[in-house]
UniProtKB/Swiss-Prot annotation:
Keyword Glycoprotein: yes
Protein name stated in the entry: Autophagy-related protein 22-1
Xref: InterPro entries: Atg22, Atg22-like, ATG22/LtaA_families, MFS_dom, MFS_trans_sf
GO molecular function, one term: transmembrane transporter activity
Organism: Aspergillus niger (strain ATCC MYA-4892 / CBS 513.88 / FGSC A1513)
Length: 614
């Protein structure tokens, strides 16, 4: 019989940890300190995506490139558009100019004149430079996430990789303080490194959640009753290879291996699996929602601090570099508690007798597992339709965000503090949207797919409104069609509302189409589709901007990009998808274990906005 550990935390929980399933398996109950470490990293890193990527990083890259560029109109006159040199043009005072950009939107103003730079002899718009940088960082991020998933899931590298990526990303962000405009290419490199490391570290952070849930004292003390199967023995050989076994080595499954097997031996797989995991999913949602809330609170606090710093330092290029340093410092500082308090929680060795311990074997295993999942998806028509729609929709969400910030800066002349405020408004609207869409869905008795369609239609209003600026009658008014800075604020509200709904309902809708027992593998494919799609949209917007010399024509592309998922989503048949998924699950149930995909467990975690609605 397994002896209970004698640590104070375990005694306080009054639970006996199950026996290890493999050498090095850490089955100790989740402690409050471990949870605090997990929350701490959300508090640390969430500021990067909200404050840096959502506000200050794109405009910093554009501004530094602008100061080294020349006017598009004659390709000779330098674009010396520092924020401080223009501040005196407004008599309203430092704080009032946050909301008053009318002085800078006149034709020929250095703030709104389109500027170009030359990289390897190629002419690039300064706004396009920021978009290309983002696309490249997302591409590298997607490759890295797939490649490292094997090492993160199998072996003792999970925590080590998280800390390494956090340190590299935070230091890269802090180094912006030393990047002067003539080194803008170095700034682009730091942006790529920091965004790549952020994405990788957050995926690793998400991989801890199912482990924290699985070994939570509430669940470990409940073996044998409630939603946990009874009569199961914690056999240390339960992960042995053999025909007919499910993936017992998947480190982030909410149920332990013996629970997964019982869940599929009692008849109707779908209903049994749901009943066995309901308690785990409730706890997972609770912990994840707490982490989301903590991360958002930290992001809002730092965003407010950044706006104050930018205003008080007169909104110069140095102001932008300074706030990026503060963002990196925040990220670095609050990573320390996570590094101290999170347990390593090693994963099992690579299965099937594969050679382990080398990075090449981990990478090969990860890519082969992804390939198996992709091949399996070919037989699920509705999942293919949904993933195609999600690919386009996710790309549209990411592209609209970056395009809007750069459009507001380069064509509306909005100052950094005002751009930061737009992001705060959108985030608050997103939290409200995550809750309000569920109310709308219940009120009008909408299915998940219908709610997604409603969100898409509302989202389509954003680029269509920008296209109104091409209509001569509206253009002559001098407002409407994104001709005035104040118009960005209501559009920020719409964007936030849509984000809150789409992120919640798309994931839950996709979950209905997944074969029972293969959630982690298919959610990994969902996450990779999400991450990888953002490579294309920003790059295409950059190409359009280079071609026409301004960002507004890119609204045509954005309108098409957002509209394309609509017919695909309407073609998805949920009932047919469920039948196909269950049939495939039954077909694969008796296959040898080596055919069962395990890839992508590190992404098996609801994302931030998704859990707000649950």
């Amino acid at each position: 019989m397994q002896n209970c550990t004698n640590s104070p935390e375990d005694q306080a929980a009054s639970v006996c940890p199950p026996p290890p399933q493999f050498p090095g398996d850490d089955t100790r109950p989740t402690s409050k300190k471990e949870l605090a470490g997990w929350y701490s990293y959300g508090w640390a890193a969430e500021v990067f995506t909200v404050c840096a990527m959502g506000s200050f990083l794109p405009i910093t890259l554009e501004q530094m490139a602008r100061e080294r560029g020349v006017l598009l109109s004659d390709k000779k006159t330098p674009c010396s558009a520092t924020w401080s040199s223009l501040e005196s043009t407004s008599p309203s005072g430092t704080w009032n100019t946050i909301f008053d950009a009318t002085a800078f939107t006149k034709p020929g103003s250095p703030r709104t004149s389109q500027c170009i730079i030359y990289i390897l002899g190629v002419e690039i718009n300064t706004a396009s430079f920021a978009m290309y940088t983002f696309s490249l960082s997302v591409f590298i991020q997607a490759i890295l996430i797939i490649s490292m998933s094997g090492a993160a899931d199998h072996g003792s590298y999970r925590k080590m990789l998280l800390v390494i990526f956090a340190l590299i990303g935070s230091v890269s962000t802090m180094l912006f303080l030393a990047v002067v405009p003539r080194l803008y290419l170095l700034g682009g490199l730091f942006a790529i490194i920091s965004n790549t490391c952020f994405g990788a570290s957050f995926v690793l952070l998400n991989s801890f959640l199912p482990l924290l849930v699985r070994y939570h004292p509430i669940l470990m003390g409940g073996h044998g009753d409630g939603d946990i199967p009874t009569g199961t023995s914690h056999d240390s050989t339960s992960t042995a290879d053999g025909p007919g076994q499910t993936d017992g080595t998947e480190t982030t499954s909410l149920l332990r291996p013996e629970q997964n097997r019982n869940a599929y031996s009692l008849g109707d797989e779908t209903q049994v699996f749901a009943s066995k995991t309901s308690q785990e999913l409730k706890l997972s949602t609770k912990l994840s929602s707490n982490g989301i809330g903590i991360g958002y609170i930290g992001a809002v606090i730092l965003q407010a601090i950044c706006i104050l710093v930018v205003v008080e330092t007169h909104q110069t290029t140095f102001s932008l570099r300074l706030v990026l340093f503060l963002i990196g410092l925040w990220w670095f500082t609050f990573t320390i508690p996570a590094a101290m308090w999170l347990r390593a929680r090693p994963g099992p060795p690579l299965p099937y007798g594969k050679e382990s311990g080398t990075w090449t074997s981990y990478m090969a295993y990860a890519w082969k597992s992804l390939g198996r999942t992709v091949m399996r998806t070919r037989h699920l028509r509705d999942i293919l339709l949904f993933l195609a729609a999600w690919f386009l929709l996710s790309d549209g969400i990411a592209t609209v965000s970056g395009t809007a910030v750069l459009f507001a800066k380069t064509q509306l002349g909005m100052q950094p503090a005002a751009l930061g405020l737009i992001n705060v408004i959108a985030m608050i609207a997103g939290v409200f949207g995550a809750f309000s869409w569920s109310f709308v869905s219940r009120t009008f008795n909408l299915r998940a797919s219908q709610t997604i369609v409603a969100c898409i239609i509302l989202f389509e209003l954003v680029p269509l409104y920008g296209l109104l600026g091409f209509i001569p009658a509206i253009k002559s008014l001098g407002y409407l069609g994104l001709q005035q800075p104040w118009e960005m604020y209501p559009l920020g509200v719409i964007y936030g509302l849509v984000m809150g709904g789409l992120s919640s309902y798309c994931r839950s809708f996709f979950g209905e189409l997944i074969p029972p027992g293969y959630e982690a593998a298919f959610y990994a494919l969902y996450a990779i589709t999400d991450k990888g799609s953002s490579v294309f949209g920003p790059a295409i917007v950059g190409i359009i901007t280079d071609r026409y010399g301004e960002i507004r024509p890119a609204f045509v592309f954005l309108a098409v990009l957002i509209l394309l998922p609509l017919p695909l989503m309407l073609l998805v048949d949920v009932e047919r998808g469920k039948r196909d998924a269950l049939s495939l699950s039954k077909e694969l149930k008796g296959r040898p274990r080596q055919e069962v995909p395990v890839y992508g467990a590190v992404t098996h975690c609801p994302s931030h906005s998704e859990n707000l609605a649950e």
